[in-house]
């Protein structure tokens, strides 16, 4: 009874030891309680022969069971450890994940029919192979081979992208539908010359000039030619450059007349807009270089003699007596200089405020021009003596007393009328 009890306890102890996965030592210690002290005491006791044999049997059974058992989880771990996952290749900035494979597929010269046939036939082949794989029984070896084979296929094989639809332009870039034939203009209207296309701007310029001129000139004083030409302005083809240049020159001439002091009133016939004149009339033969009116060059003595304000060779005393008798401010005349030199050929005599001012007219050989005075009045140059007289009829002349060397005391006067010769001066 005691032996059976010992066997039972020994077997249960051996099962516990097997579960804890270690073998019994050769010498083991059993705890015993001391009755006197009530504490555990460990005593070493050698194992019996049958206990040694039992432990050896248990160890052999354990090793045999480990060899026969096939664990699929361990196999999976071994296969996954053998697979190496490499990092993804860098993509260029100009390439994207969805366009990389599409570019490779587009480079291959395949017709559209072959692409569609491949893309359509591929899903049917995949479904058939999947059905065959499901029907066959899968063994352990095949399973491991499939795992390794699928991994290699995933690593080496590049999947083809799905077929893309045809590229279509956005709605805003799509071409417009063709125009109906009724709305198309005829060919004669479509192909026009640039001169005809500039006609609206010419008409608007003429209308503007007519409106501005209508505010200044009454309607009853206009020429009938202007209204007649305005009616036929659609048939005339006048270049825009000519009309604009004539418009600017006419405005420039009007400003010059206003700047001269308004001595000559502007008549309605002279103040017509450029639209009422032909292009040949608007083109002037000369060009304005300054604010002075243009005159032909008359620098010779013979050209000066025909003017009424030129008296020739007279003494200074006789001229001053004649001015005192006339006694009109602004009266003037031109006489020959007493020195009779080429540099100072003439003298301009002006009466103002009961005093006669004698101003020399100098001739500049370098420029072939005339200048007035010694330079204190300014550095103005003229092409002829007539230019000097016409200029100071419109602008005041600066009169400086000969006794005043500093030129501080100055007076201004316009040339109004020449001194009558028959009244006060006797012919020489």
Swiss-Prot record:
Residues 159-164 are annotated as: Mediates interaction with PLCG1. One of its GO terms (molecular function) is protein-containing complex binding. The modification Phosphotyrosine is found at residues 69, 96. GO terms for biological process: cell surface receptor protein tyrosine kinase signaling pathway; intracellular signal transduction; mast cell degranulation; negative regulation of natural killer cell activation; positive regulation of natural killer cell cytokine production. The record marks 335 as: Interaction with FYB1. The N-terminal proline-rich region interacts with the SH3 domain of PLCG1. The SH2 domain is important for restoration of BCR-induced calcium response and JNK2 activation in BLNK-deficient DT40 cells expressing LAT. When phosphorylated, interacts with PLCG1, PLCG2, GRB2, VAV and LAT. Interacts with LBR and AGO2. Interacts with FGR. Part of a complex consisting of CLNK, SKAP1 and FYB1. Interacts (via SH2 domain) with FYB1; this interaction allows SKAP1 and FYB1 to promote tyrosine phosphorylation of CLNK by LYN. Interacts (via SH2 domain) with MAP4K1. This is Cytokine-dependent hematopoietic cell linker.
């Amino acid at each position: 009874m005691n032996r059976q009890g010992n066997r039972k306890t020994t077997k249960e102890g051996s099962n516990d030891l097997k579960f804890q996965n270690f073998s019994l030592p050769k010498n083991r210690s059993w705890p015993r309680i001391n009755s006197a002290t009530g504490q555990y005491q460990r005593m070493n006791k050698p194992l019996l022969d049958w206990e040694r044999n039992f432990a050896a049997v248990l160890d052999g059974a354990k090793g045999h069971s480990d060899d026969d058992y096939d664990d699929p989880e361990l196999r999976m771990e071994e296969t996954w450890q053998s697979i190496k996952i490499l990092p993804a290749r860098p993509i260029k900035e100009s390439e994207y994940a969805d366009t990389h494979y599409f570019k490779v597929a587009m480079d291959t010269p395949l017709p559209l029919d072959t692409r569609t046939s491949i893309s359509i036939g591929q899903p049917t082949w995949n479904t058939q192979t999947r059905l065959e794989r499901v029907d066959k029984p899968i063994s352990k070896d095949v399973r491991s081979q499939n795992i390794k084979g699928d991994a290699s296929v995933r690593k080496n094989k590049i999947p083809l992208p799905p077929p893309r639809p045809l590229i279509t332009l956005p709605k805003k870039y799509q071409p417009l539908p063709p125009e109906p034939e009724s709305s198309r203009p005829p060919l004669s209207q479509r192909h026009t010359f640039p001169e005809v296309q500039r006609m609206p701007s010419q008409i608007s310029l003429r209308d503007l000039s007519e409106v501005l001129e209508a505010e200044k000139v009454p309607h009853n004083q206009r020429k009938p030619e202007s209204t007649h030409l305005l009616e036929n302005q659609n048939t005339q083809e006048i270049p825009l450059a000519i009309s604009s240049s004539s418009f600017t020159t006419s405005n420039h001439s009007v400003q010059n007349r206003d700047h001269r002091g308004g001595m000559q009133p502007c008549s309605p016939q002279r103040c017509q807009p450029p639209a009422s004149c032909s292009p040949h009339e608007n083109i002037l033969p000369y060009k304005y270089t300054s604010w002075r009116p243009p005159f032909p060059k008359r620098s010779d003595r013979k050209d000066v003699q025909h003017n009424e304000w030129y008296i020739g060779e007279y003494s200074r005393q006789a001229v001053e007596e004649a001015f005192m008798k006339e006694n009109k401010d602004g009266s003037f005349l031109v006489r020959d200089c007493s020195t009779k030199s080429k540099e100072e050929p003439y003298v301009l005599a002006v009466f103002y405020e009961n005093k006669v001012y004698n101003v020399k007219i100098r001739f500049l050989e370098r420029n072939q021009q005339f200048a007035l005075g010694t330079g204190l009045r300014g550095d103005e140059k003229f092409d002829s003596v007539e230019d000097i007289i016409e200029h100071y009829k419109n602008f005041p002349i600066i009169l400086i007393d000969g006794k005043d060397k500093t030129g501080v005391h100055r007076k201004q006067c316009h040339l109004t009328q020449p001194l009558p010769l028959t009244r006060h001066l006797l012919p020489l």
